[in-house]
Swiss-Prot record:
Pfam families in the record: Ribosomal_L1
Record-level GO BP terms: regulation of translation; translation
Keyword terms: Repressor, Ribonucleoprotein, Ribosomal protein, RNA-binding, rRNA-binding, Translation regulation, tRNA-binding
Subunit composition and interactions: Part of the 50S ribosomal subunit.
A cellular component term, taken from the record's GO annotations: cytosolic large ribosomal subunit
Family as reported in the entry's similarity comment: Belongs to the universal ribosomal protein uL1 family.
InterPro entries attached to this UniProt entry: Ribosom_uL1_bac-type, Ribosomal_uL1, Ribosomal_uL1-like, Ribosomal_uL1/biogenesis, Ribosomal_uL1_3-a/b-sand, Ribosomal_uL1_CS
Provenance organism: Ralstonia pickettii (strain 12J)
Name used for this protein in its record: Large ribosomal subunit protein uL1
Function in brief: Binds directly to 23S rRNA. The L1 stalk is quite mobile in the ribosome, and is involved in E site tRNA release. Protein L1 is also a translational repressor protein, it controls the translation of the L11 operon by binding to its mRNA.
GO molecular function, one term: rRNA binding
Length: 231
């Protein structure tokens, strides 16, 4: 059995595993327990009332967090002509077509997000086995395949996060950093939960947002009392 560090043990002792904390207290605890030497990310896990095995209940989408993610994002765009110029003007670091595809095939992937204009999918489609496993394959469901590449670039730069339910019916997402003010983390969490609610499958029955828990990169998970989320 792995040995728990003194810091991890001390943090674990601060949190009651079965207790549901008011959101303000939950975020305060998470920030307090985020004692690593780097600016830890603040993450959320949301248990959804869906059957992830059913194709019509796969929850997937994206949302621009109002307070951003605290991360600098490098964007690559597949576009040509006017759309290529629009992508560059919007701040994309890399814009190309076959040349960009060759870079990717050669393992040169110095970017965090890939956006594609629909007319470039003949090129992008050949990269599925490379980009797919890395979570980088452009997809219209999350707004990364779009004719409006400029807006997509701006959204990515502004703090857009993508979400997709896992096999256990849980959504995992980052809502900021330890250095964020609690109000910023709350606004980001509210935006994410609103996006999840809007993405609720029509076939999902019963309670949809079942459990919400927040944590930091190296810290413990803290369950949230959902009744306090609207406060």
């Amino acid at each position: 059995m792995a040995k728990i560090s003194k810091r991890a043990a001390a943090n674990k002792a601060k949190v009651e595993r079965t207790k549901f904390y008011p959101i303000d207290e939950a975020l305060s605890l998470v920030k307090e327990c985020a004692s690593a030497k780097f600016d830890e990310s603040i993450d959320v896990a949301v248990q959804l009332g869906i059957d992830a095995k059913k194709s019509d209940q796969v929850v997937r989408g994206s949302v621009v967090l109002p307070a951003g993610t605290g991360k600098s994002v490098r964007v690559a765009v597949f576009a040509q002509g006017d759309k290529a110029e629009q992508a560059k003007a919007a701040g994309a670091e890399i814009v190309g077509m076959e040349d960009l595809a060759e870079q990717i095939k050669a393992g040169k992937m110095d970017f965090d997000v890939v956006i594609a204009s629909p007319d470039t999918m003949r090129v992008v489609g050949t990269l599925g086995q490379i980009l797919g496993p890395r979570g980088l394959m452009p997809n219209p469901k999350v707004g990364t395949v779009t004719p409006d590449v400029a807006t997509a670039v701006k959204n990515a730069k502004a703090g857009q996060v993508q979400f997709r339910v896992d096999k256990a019916g849980i959504i995992h997402a980052t809502i900021g950093r330890r250095s964020f003010e609690p109000a910023a983390l709350k606004s980001n969490l509210a935006a994410l939960l609103d996006a999840l609610t809007k993405a609720k499958p029509a076939s999902s029955k019963g309670v949809y947002l079942r459990k919400v828990a927040v944590s930091s990169t190296m810290g413990v998970g803290v369950r949230v009392d959902q009744a306090t989320l609207a406060a």
